[in-house]
Amino acid sequence: MNYFSTRDHQHIVSAAQAIACGLAPDGGLFVPETLPEVSAQQLQALCGMTYQQRAVEIMRPFLSEFSDEELTHFTAAAYGSQFDDAAVAPLRRLDDTTAFLELWHGPTCAFKDMALQILPYLLTASLKKCGEQRQVCILVATSGDTGKAALQGFADVPGTKILVFYPYSGVSEIQRLQMVTQTGSNVAVSAVRGNFDDAQTGVKQIFGDKAFADALSQRGWFLSSANSINWGRLLPQIVYYFSAYCDAVNGGMIAMGDELNFVVPTGNFGDILAGWYAKQMGLPVGKLVCASNANNVLTDFIHTGTYDKNRPFHTTASPSMDILVSSNLERLLYSLCGSDTEVAGYMQQLREQGRYTVSDALLAKISETFAGGFCNDIQTREKIGRAWRDHRYLIDTHTAVAYHVLDEYRRETGDAAPAVVVSTASPFKFCDQVLRGIGGTADAFGPELIRRLTCETQIDAPAPLTGLDARPVRFGGCVDQSQMLHTVDEFLK
């Protein structure tokens, strides 16, 4: 399986090269030349497998340079005892037609673990397959969860360093503490004055600086990404859509072959894009419902075909979705229109004007699979309260956004098909909002809120989140976007 850039289909690379580079030299994103088909017989076979085995089966055709032995080792190591549920990504039924896919049982209590626990194995193996002699520095811009998951995955991995940038005042206190207390001799963390888009733009500019790349190469370094712009991040996410479907069949929620809707809280469009790839591979997915918070640029795009980032930026109760530039949308546009020239034009308009409008034909294709909705913080807390009162089920703010959007989608469309809400984070990562949602008092700070939520609900907090206030803070720096390149340069000296 080869890959090429969304902005130049003549730039062809292997899977190992795509994972090692992260971002194409022209600024585009790598996409597979074809999508393998999963037959009904293969899907039935997946139902009898463990999560680790399902991961090997789904990823194998995308990684033709990797042996089954390698993939089996990678998945066993990535999805092992560091997950506190043997199912890895368990499906929890709420009622006859609604289930929650819990993707937060890993070491950082967020769905990013599903990809970032295996990415270090894929990346280090890819570097060897490419004959790369230089060391790699992983650059990450995070809206909260990716940063900690990437730090945890790459901490003390030989031949690597990792530097994470997060928006100052743009993550929860628990997310911040998780990052700034990270252990490891090869890690660093810095806040950026601004929002996530400022941090992400800064990282992209560093990747696009050829003179800086040449200077680093002279010193034996090159840069790569652990954000979902890297295909090695996105590929493992396809797996859990297949796994959720199999678990829905095994649990009697649906029959084999029935369509299943998925509702996905997303900001950068990577999580829901993985679901779209799964559908294209043959998974019986009905609608993919994109759930946004007040930064509803994706909802507007799905409804109108116009992507316009020229709007106020809102800091919300679901900070991991506080994003106005959704990088992975570029992959969907390429896959649907098939023209690198057209996609490059859209991306140029976005850079220069902050907006673009797709053709009516392209919007019609998008609307065949995607629906969209959004909710505000008050509605988010109301949904947290409803899930707790009616079902004694505790959900975080991002999951609550998706739960609200599902109810609105069903009410507006009459589509009562079984649906899975993708639950992306432990409720204990956003204790203040969760406490307010269930009627508790949130007049405390950070780890004290974890203890208070445990007391209020009689649910134990995940082990990785306990004792954060007792860990030494290692990283306290804050820089402007213009200083990010200098920060990377100093880190690699």
Describe every region a protein language model picked out.
Residues 1-493:
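PLP-dependent amino-acid enzyme catalytic core
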